[in-house]
């Protein structure tokens, strides 16, 4: 459903980017109607988020380490089945999850999703993180911000893709050890990050030790990890919010987390 960014130019709309677009986000406020600015309209149009039915809110949540881009969607239905916390994977962002957001809304669920630090419209070094524990701090900060929101009724469910799945696994295991109830009642893990593929160069500690001494980031290699060629082409060639480099800090943080 995504557009070629050139369409935005034809419509006299700005193309989203990680430098200027986040500066135009307002604090997330679920207590009033959200009216997007021209730049946010462009973002929503590019990723077909403006085609979703229901009510939406968009903005940022400020926390000690990060300024996080958050989106909330509520379906047009009298009885909402619950709320899904949708977490994307590494080198992705929440905008490209429009199809699954649409499906969840059609099924009668509210949806909360956010860009991980260093991704999409959230701040932080691009495609990087200093410590995987920061992902847990972000999850808890978002939970504290929205836990009493009428738009996000119980039960709360979690969906996580790749690194998003790792975030949920970390949360569930940590809370199990503490004998505390987790944020969500159930989770759906999509290709969760458990360990890097053995074919990945950073799976080799010798290679990782050498590269970390000479590089702060390495080029990203786009893989065919989807059966939709149009989607793969958009991600590789057209999406202005796709990172082109992988941060070594993220790779090292992942290695320590494992």
Positions of PLM-derived features:
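An N-terminal hydrophobic leader/cap segment in hydrolases
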Residues: 1-62, 67-76
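Short beta-strand element of the alpha/beta-hydrolase
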Residues: 80-89
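Catalytic nucleophile-loop/oxyanion-hole region of alpha/beta-hydrolase
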Residues: 90-96, 119-152
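Conserved alpha/beta-hydrolase
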Residues: 94, 101-124
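Alpha/beta-hydrolase fold nucleophile elbow
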Residues: 150-162
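Alpha/beta-hydrolase-fold enzymes
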Residues: 161-250
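Conserved serine/cysteine hydrolase catalytic core
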Residues: 255-258
């Amino acid at each position: 459903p995504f557009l070629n960014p050139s369409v935005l130019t034809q419509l006299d709309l700005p193309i989203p980017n990680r430098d200027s677009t986040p500066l135009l986000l307002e604090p997330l406020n679920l207590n009033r109607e959200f009216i997007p600015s021209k730049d946010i309209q462009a973002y929503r149009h590019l990723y077909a988020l403006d085609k979703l039915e229901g009510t939406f809110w968009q903005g940022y949540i400020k926390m000690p380490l990060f300024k996080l881009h958050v989106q909330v969607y509520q379906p047009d239905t009298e009885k909402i089945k619950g709320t899904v916390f949708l977490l994307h994977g590494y080198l992705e962002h929440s905008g490209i999850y429009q199809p699954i957001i649409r499906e969840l809304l059609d099924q009668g669920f509210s949806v909360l999703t956010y860009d991980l630090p260093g991704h999409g419209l959230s701040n932080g070094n691009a495609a990087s993180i200093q410590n995987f524990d920061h992902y847990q701090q972000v999850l808890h900060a978002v939970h504290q911000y929205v836990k009493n929101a009428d738009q996000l009724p119980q039960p709360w469910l979690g969906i996580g893709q790749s690194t998003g799945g790792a975030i949920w696994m970390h949360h569930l295991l940590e809370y199990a050890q503490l004998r505390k109830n987790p944020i969500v009642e159930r989770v759906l893990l999509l290709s969760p990050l458990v360990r890097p593929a053995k074919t990945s160069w950073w799976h080799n500690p010798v290679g990782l030790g050498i590269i970390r001494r000479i590089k702060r980031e390495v080029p990203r290699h786009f893989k065919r990890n989807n059966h939709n060629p149009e989607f793969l082409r958009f991600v590789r060639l057209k999406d202005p919010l796709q990172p082109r480099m992988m941060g070594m800090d993220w790779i090292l943080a992942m290695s320590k987390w494992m």
